Amino acid sequence: MASIIYSPKDIFEQEFKTSMSGFNKKEVDEFLDNVIQDYETYISEIEELKAEIERLKNQNTHPKSPSTENRHAMVQPTRVAQSATNFDILKRISRLEKEVFGKQITE
């Protein structure tokens, strides 16, 4: 992709040297050629960006795979369930230890 040569400020501030019959025609022609090239570059960039916007819109309306999203959503509940199960096991062990060791202390 061609690079942009002039900014709007550059175009606004451009001054041409004058010759006997007015501005130097060669300098003005070169400047205008570069302006035309810039506009062609802008048009090309705009078209590429429009195409990318369309591609992203289509990608957004057609998600990759619902199973991928569900897989990530399922990870959290699985961890919570495992934590709850581990907590229940620890409570049972604690209760059993109290029963076993509590009886030994009284005997």
From Swiss-Prot:
Record note on quaternary structure: Forms polymers through the coiled coil domains. Interacts with PBP1, MreC and EzrA.
InterPro entries: Cell_cycle_GpsB, DivIVA_domain, DivIVA_fam
Compositional bias ranges of the Polar residues kind: 58-68
Record's keyword annotation contains Phosphoprotein: no
Keywords for this protein: Cell cycle, Cell division, Cell shape, Coiled coil, Cytoplasm
Pfam families in the cross-refs: DivIVA
Residue span of region Disordered: 57-80
Designated name of the protein: Cell cycle protein GpsB
Annotated coiled-coil segments of the chain: 32-65
Function statement: Divisome component that associates with the complex late in its assembly, after the Z-ring is formed, and is dependent on DivIC and PBP2B for its recruitment to the divisome. Together with EzrA, is a key component of the system that regulates PBP1 localization during cell cycle progression. Its main role could be the removal of PBP1 from the cell pole after pole maturation is completed. Also contributes to the recruitment of PBP1 to the division complex. Not essential for septum formation.
Encoding gene per record: gpsB
Family: Belongs to the GpsB family.
Subcellular location: Cytoplasm
An annotated GO BP: regulation of cell shape
A Gene Ontology cellular-component term: cytoplasm
